[in-house]
Amino acid sequence: MTSDDTAQPSGARRIETRPDLTAAQKDAVLALLDEAAQVDGQQAVSEQGRLQLRGGPREGVRHLLLSVGEDLVGYAQLEDNDPVEAPAAELVVHPSHRGHGHGRALGSALLAESGKRLRVWAHGGHSAARHLAQVLGLTLFRELRQMRRSLTDFDPAEPVLPEGVTVRAFVPGEDDAAWLAANAEAFAHHPEQGSLTQRDLDDRKGEPWFDPAGFFLAFRGEELVGFHWTKAHAAEQLGEVYVVGVRPGAQGGGLGKALTTIGLRHLAAQGLPTAMLYVDADNKAAVTVYERLGFVTYETDLMYRSET
C-alpha cells in the first residue's frame, strides 16, 4: 500500500509503504544509504536495519520509499517488534534532495504508520536531524555513545577470569542455541539485543566480517555464562567491541571486564589501530568500566520519541 494514494503528476513527491522490497528497490535503497553515508560520515540506518533489507519480509518491519518522479530520494524503515516500546524508525534523505521538506514528509508518514507512537534514531545527532525531531514534535529520550580508544599502545595486564571459568571461541552451528539463550538472559532489559533470533544470528554469520575466532564464549562447566563478540571493520581499520554479555548469575565477579580485555587483545593482534564500542549514556556503570579501559566518547547517536 502507499501512504499517498492520489495520482500525482511526474515530479511530484510520492511515498510508498511496503512490507518487502523488490531486488531493484533494495539496490536503490542501498545505493542511497551509501551516498548519504559518504556525505554524513556515518550510516543513517543501523546494521540491523540494513540486514532487514535482505531475504524476504520481516515480521513487524515496513519500508517507506519516497520518490520524486522516477528517482528514489528518501527511505525510512519502521520496526514494530518491541512488546512494550513504541515502533522504532530510521530515515534518510539523499544529500542532493535535502531542504525540500522530504524529511518532514517521511517523518509525518512514519507517525501515521505508527499510530503516532514512534521512536526515531538520529545517528550522529546532526543539527538537521535535531531540527526535524523538533518540527515533528518529538522529544529526546535516549543517547547512545560511540566510544573509542587507541590499540597501538594497548598493553593490559593478563585478564583474570573468575574461578572455574574457561574461555574458548564460538563454534558455528554447535553453539548457536546456547548463545541465543545466554544473550536473551544477559540482555533481558534490552530488547534490541536480547530479542535476537536464529535468523538474526545467521544474518550476521553470513557477513564478510564474521570471524568465529573473535567470538569468545566463557563457560563455567557446561554452562555458557558470558561472551564477547568482536567485529573488524577492515575498510575503516576499526575493531569493535560488538557485544559483551554476562548472564545475571555470573555478574559482579569481573567476568565482563576480563572478556572485554580478551577481545581487545584479539583486535590489537589483528593490527587494528583503534577500538570502538557503543554504550547507552545512562548506563553509568558500563561507561565507567570503559573509561577505565581508556575509552573516550567519539560521537553520540540520539533517539527521539513521540509523547502520545
Swiss-Prot record:
GO terms for biological process: mycothiol biosynthetic process. It is an enzyme of class 2 (transferase). Residues 1-20 are annotated as: Disordered. Residues 15-152, 165-308 form the N-acetyltransferase domain. Pfam families: Acetyltransf_1. Keywords: Acyltransferase, Repeat, Transferase. It comes from the Bacteria. GO terms for molecular function: mycothiol synthase activity. Acetyl-CoA 2 binds at V244, G245, V246, Q251, G252, G253, G254, L255, G256, K257. It catalyses: 1D-myo-inositol 2-(L-cysteinylamino)-2-deoxy-alpha-D-glucopyranoside + acetyl-CoA = mycothiol + CoA + H(+). 1D-myo-inositol 2-(L-cysteinylamino)-2-deoxy-alpha-D-glucopyranoside binds at E47, E192, K231, E240, Y278. InterPro entries: Acyl_CoA_acyltransferase, Bact_Acetyltransf, GNAT_dom, Mycothiol_AcTrfase. Acetyl-CoA 1 binds at L91, V92, V93. Its EC number is 2.3.1.189. Monomer. Catalyzes the transfer of acetyl from acetyl-CoA to desacetylmycothiol (Cys-GlcN-Ins) to form mycothiol. Belongs to the acetyltransferase family. MshD subfamily. PANTHER family: AMINOALKYLPHOSPHONATE N-ACETYLTRANSFERASE-RELATED-RELATED (PTHR43877). NCBIfam families: mycothiol_MshD (TIGR03448). HAMAP family: MshD. This is Mycothiol acetyltransferase. It comes from Streptomyces scabiei (strain 87.22). The lineage of its organism: Bacteria, Bacillati, Actinomycetota, Actinomycetes, Kitasatosporales.
